[in-house]
Amino acid sequence: MSKIIGIDLGTTNSAVAVLEGTESKIIANPEGNRTTPSVVSFKNGEIIVGDAAKRQAVTNPETVISIKSKMGTSEKVSANGKEYTPQEISAMILQYLKGYAEDYLGEKVEKAVITVPAYFNDAQRQATKDAGKIAGLEVERIVNEPTAAALAYGMDKTDKDEKILVFDLGGGTFDVSILELGDGVFDVLATAGDNKLGGDDFDQKIIDFLVAEFKKENGIDLSQDKMALQRLKDAAEKAKKDLSGVTQTQISLPFITAGSAGPLHLEMSLSRAKFDDLTRDLVERTKTPVRQALSDAGLSLSEIDEVILVGGSTRIPAVVEAVKAETGKEPNKSVNPDEVVAMGAAIQGGVITGDVKDVVLLDVTPLSLGIETMGGVFTKLIDRNTTIPTSKSQVFSTAADNQPAVDIHVLQGERPMAADNKTLGRFQLTDIPAAPRGIPQIEVTFDIDKNGIVSVKAKDLGTQKEQHIVIKSNDGLSEEEIDRMMKDAEANAEADAKRKEEVDLKNEVDQAIFATEKTIKETEGKGFDTERDAAQSALDELKAAQESGNLDDMKAKLEALNEKAQALAVKMYEQAAAAQQAAQGAEGAQANDSANNDDVVDGEFTEK
């Protein structure tokens, strides 16, 4: 069976891992980094992903960041003269991760386990699955991020019974899960969280502070300047990271904008104490989900054996202190918070292929599921923190005499009224025989699969007629749309590879022309006429090929120029080496003269 890769598709950074033997290994990206920025940019029709995309975010307005926060919504992003769904942008990130995983493994990768925040609802999970499909991946399992982290932490502790609390504060989401580990069973007891809390919010607090201070000083609102705002974002992220290690950092952004008197610069120092003050409310918000999860699990703090920190934002000292204060425990630092989720996903991939034995993962649904009943009430069929996969049925009836159909309004959430919860979908059961209200028996069955994705069935027990749907939110993609996007992604992958090859060649040509012109200039009048003329001739031919835009011709002429330029460089090197040797010889002779002069003795002369 081919390898199943594990992917942590994060808000700010993503990672990919694979199981090698019994070890889960993070695969480094082409730049040698173990995590990849979840950033996509478009330039001259080319799709750029990861580190290169993040580097040009300041100067390129066609850059998309934090797309994960839009998953499961109908929001689209405009770039490259097109409108893209969050699933398509996420698919570009997944495609990039898949590509360098294939390069590392030396084989095609077609299957993946992808992680999502535990508090993702059905629409967000479905959107993640669709993104995988568009990227050419069969998503074998959607796993909750804290659960994946627990898998990676507990893999070598399967002989030990433990209750652990996973505190996962990422770039855009926050989850807390409580698990029981024992005999290879990873049983999620409860999960809670906040889908709108993460490292991005901590960055935003710094940005708001810098904008306010600059406005106070200069009367200019930097938040209205797109390019200045992107520079502020980069500076805020860097300052936040710096303050995890030092107590004060300097933020320096020269030429941030211009005033009536000329260019203006932003120079400010930020202390850790000030940062803690700015973000105090965010740290406070992490406490409620911790208490909620403990309450749902029916556990007291004294029953928790270990606290595991996951996500880059758990490096913030105030967050670590809050976790200690809230749990009364020193967090376990045996796992890398940036990598552990992808590693756990790869382990789950190994469980599916059978490479990892005697491990059972029992996850839960994070939110209650049910339907709208008379008076707009939300009637729960499946409570939150129910172990999945699961199925639950309940019998309902009609609200009016001779009612021919019932509308099934499927919802997810915890509020008592339907209007306050998230709509997952609606469907109708029709052709109900005429009968007084309360007589027809309508059985509604909810099924949640191992990925946390919901399907609902309504059945008239009198006629045995039934209606069945897999929930697709209003913001979800149809099969046709997914197929079209898959084809686009495949076509783009080929076109992108070709375009990248072209860009690389053109850059190489530019570099070779610049370097050769410099060498020819430097060797003027130094007696290498034959080599200089040959290099000049090859240079002119390459320039002509560059002008024509013929790639094959450019490739051939580039090789020819490299050969001639190399010959000229060798001559230069030989001359330089000879000159150095001659200089060393002269120094030696001078040293000998100096040594001979040492025999002369100074004496005093006295007049008589």
Curated annotation (Swiss-Prot):
Listed Low complexity bias regions: 578-598
Inducing factors: By stress conditions e.g. heat shock.
Spans through the membrane: none
Pfam families for this protein: HSP70 (PF00012)
Assigned keywords, A-Z: ATP-binding, Chaperone, Nucleotide-binding, Phosphoprotein, Stress response
Keyword Ubl conjugation tagged: no
The keyword tRNA-binding is annotated on this UniProt entry: no
Modification Phosphothreonine, positions: T173
Region Disordered, annotated ranges: 578-608
Segments of skewed composition (Acidic residues): 599-608
Molecular function (Gene Ontology), one example: ATP-dependent protein folding chaperone
InterPro entries reported for this sequence: ATPase_NBD (IPR043129), Chaperone_DnaK (IPR012725), Heat_shock_70_CS (IPR018181), HSP70_C_sf (IPR029048), HSP70_peptide-bd_sf (IPR029047), Hsp_70_fam (IPR013126)
Family: Belongs to the heat shock protein 70 family.
Function: Acts as a chaperone.
NCBIfam families: PRK00290.1, prok_dnaK
Protein name: Chaperone protein DnaK
Record lineage: Bacteria, Bacillati, Bacillota, Bacilli, Lactobacillales
Gene label: dnaK
